[in-house]
């Protein structure tokens, strides 16, 4: 949905090595006298296991796994059943889409918080053309360019393009808070009006429009509603993203139709060619200052524009489209007590800041910050990460060591890694104050939504999300703005192709 240069959010120092209660150590206690005891820990040597699982017969195995993943079991049961079968959080399987879109669906799955971080180690894994998994969407959907998200840090263009994204974020930092306030005040006014008229209101459509308007206004200095694009942005982006992600999503159609339509053959890029051109024209017209910086970095205007479009529409808008409804769902389910605590904390700090939302004021809201981190832990906007082993590796789970051969593809499903019961208490629950206090803050290194630990920062040498701090900031702004205006809410939750579908059934103003 990534930022270090100017939106860097201060965190306590978490880089010192503090033994976790889950570390694989056996204590040895030596008594020297009646008054002194020395506790020495020694690591337990884990046994080496062959990676369990198999890929089945060519063609048939990948197809069967695809049907299980999407229809017969669903994602969670797909992984849980294999953990139980193999008695391991690391195993071999096929990942969609399989035939006939990808020639090699074979992966090694990592489903625990100990093994998962290897996917962030640029010295051990390569990220080239693995952003969407075992298949790569046609570059016809991105102007003929391999976009930043598909580049490995070792590729020359990676550094140039990531620097451009850092520049975009840092150069517009002063516009984020005021534009967010204006845009989301408009959204809340629309929700209020519809609630008065109908008694309930759908959240997703208005949230999508607000997200796109905010990104355009804050990062590019233009309100899209006042341009030729009008209010069409979210719909155009939705169709364009569908053409890229259809092999790994389901639309809820009848099983056979859904599988044949989405997972068997690539949909032709020509279906969204005119839509994409409208988006491209919008960004090209409003990126003059960014093109100057791009040319300094050795990037052409055309390549810069396609990358800016992708970063804004796919990464940022796509992330907000998925995450904001999921976060609101979790907050609603947290109940009135948490809502009251949030409202009191937020209103008190904003009042102390002279009635304005500031970065400093938000830093003094520990519960609000924890709620955002917990939402990112429970429902990360990007659930899957991939990497290709650069060399023969040994990867540890909590229970064993596994040997991986050079060239094998590693796949991590983050909602399992960030709900690891050996790291988190009540891992499947949304615990609003989980990250409050010194002990809570120590757990932030296990929040991994940004393609890296929350305690680390994006650089040109890694694949951590360039807008990491930006995403955290706008998520905090959403919670802060919401509880300045409202006291509590109730929602009904449905499903959508990307995330949750939210209907607000009650909304109490402050």
From Swiss-Prot:
Domain of life where this protein originates: Eukaryota
GO cellular component: chloroplast inner membrane
Keyword Metal-binding on entry: yes
GO terms of biological process kind: defense response; jasmonic acid biosynthetic process; oxylipin biosynthetic process
Catalytic reaction list: (13S)-hydroperoxy-(9Z,11E,15Z)-octadecatrienoate = (9Z,13S,15Z)-12,13-epoxyoctadeca-9,11,15-trienoate + H2O; (13S)-hydroperoxy-(9Z,11E)-octadecadienoate = (9Z,13S)-12,13-epoxyoctadeca-9,11-dienoate + H2O
Tissue expression notes: Expressed in flower buds, leaves, roots, stems, petioles and cotyledons. Not detected in ripe fruits. Expressed in sieve elements.
GO molecular function, one term: oxidoreductase activity, acting on paired donors, with incorporation or reduction of molecular oxygen
Induction context: Up-regulated by wounding in local and systemic leaves.
Annotated compartments: Plastid, Chloroplast inner membrane
Transit peptide: 1-31
Membrane-related topology note: Peripheral membrane protein
Binding annotation for (13S)-hydroperoxy-(9Z,11E,15Z)-octadecatrienoate: 315
Pfam families: p450
EC class (word): lyase
EC nos: 4.2.1.92
Keywords: Chloroplast, Fatty acid biosynthesis, Fatty acid metabolism, Heme, Iron, Lipid biosynthesis, Lipid metabolism, Lyase, Membrane, Metal-binding, Oxylipin biosynthesis, Plant defense, Plastid, Plastid inner membrane, Transit peptide
UniProt: heme b binding residues: 127, 158, 162, 463, 465
Family membership noted in the UniProt record: Belongs to the cytochrome P450 family.
Protein name in UniProt: Allene oxide synthase 2, chloroplastic
């Amino acid at each position: 949905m990534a930022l270090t240069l100017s939106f860097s959010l201060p965190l306590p120092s978490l880089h010192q090595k503090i033994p976790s209660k889950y570390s694989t150590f056996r204590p040895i206690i030596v008594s020297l006298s009646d008054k002194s005891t020395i506790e020495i820990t020694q690591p337990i040597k884990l046994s080496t296991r062959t990676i369990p699982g198999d890929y089945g017969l060519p063609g048939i195995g990948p197809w069967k796994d695809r049907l299980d993943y999407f229809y017969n079991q669903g994602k969670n049961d797909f992984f849980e059943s294999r953990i139980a079968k193999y008695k391991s959080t690391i195993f071999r399987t096929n990942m969609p889409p399989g035939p006939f879109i990808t020639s090699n669906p074979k992966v090694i799955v990592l489903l625990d918080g100990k093994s998962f971080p290897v996917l962030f180690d640029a010295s051990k894994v390569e990220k080239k053309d693995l952003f969407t998994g075992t298949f790569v969407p046609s570059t016809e959907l991105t102007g003929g360019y391999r976009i930043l998200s598909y580049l490995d840090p070792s590729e020359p263009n990676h550094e140039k393009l990531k620097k451009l994204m850092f520049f975009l974020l840092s150069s517009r930092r002063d516009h984020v808070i005021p534009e967010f306030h204006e845009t989301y005040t408009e959204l809340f006014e629309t929700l209020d009006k519809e609630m008065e008229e109908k008694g309930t209101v759908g959240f997703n459509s208005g949230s999508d429009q607000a997200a796109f308007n905010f990104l355009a206004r804050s990062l590019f200095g233009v309100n899209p509603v006042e341009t030729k694009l009008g209010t069409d942005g979210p719909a155009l982006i939705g169709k364009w993203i569908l053409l890229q992600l259809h092999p790994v999503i389901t639309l809820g159609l009848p099983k056979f139709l859904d599988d044949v339509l989405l997972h068997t053959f690539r949909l032709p890029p020509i279906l969204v060619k005119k839509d994409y051109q409208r988006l491209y024209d919008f960004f090209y017209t409003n990126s003059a200052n960014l093109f100057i910086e791009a040319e300094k970095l050795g990037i052409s205007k055309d390549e810069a524009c396609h990358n800016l479009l992708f970063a804004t529409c796919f990464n940022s808008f796509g992330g907000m489209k998925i995450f904001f409804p999921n976060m609101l769902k979790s907050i609603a389910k947290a109940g009135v007590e948490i809502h009251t605590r949030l409202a009191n904390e937020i209103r008190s700090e904003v009042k102390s800041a002279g009635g304005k939302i500031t970065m400093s004021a938000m830093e003094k809201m520990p519960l609000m910050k924890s709620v955002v981190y917990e939402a990112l832990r429970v429902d990360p906007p990007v659930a899957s990460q991939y990497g290709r082993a650069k060399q023969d590796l040994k990867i540890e789970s909590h229970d064993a060591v596994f040997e991986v051969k050079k060239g094998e593809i590693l796949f991590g499903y983050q909602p399992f890694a960030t709900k690891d019961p050996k790291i988190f208490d009540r891992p499947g629950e949304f615990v609003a104050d989980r990250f409050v206090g010194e002990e809570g803050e120590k757990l932030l290194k296990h929040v991994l939504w940004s393609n890296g630990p929350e305690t680390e920062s994006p650089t040109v040498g890694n694949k951590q999300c360039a807008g990491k701090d930006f995403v955290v900031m706008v998520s905090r702004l959403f919670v802060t703005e919401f509880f300045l205006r409202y006291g509590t809410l109730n929602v009904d939750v449905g499903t959508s192709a990307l995330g949750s579908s939210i209907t607000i059934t009650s909304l109490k103003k402050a």
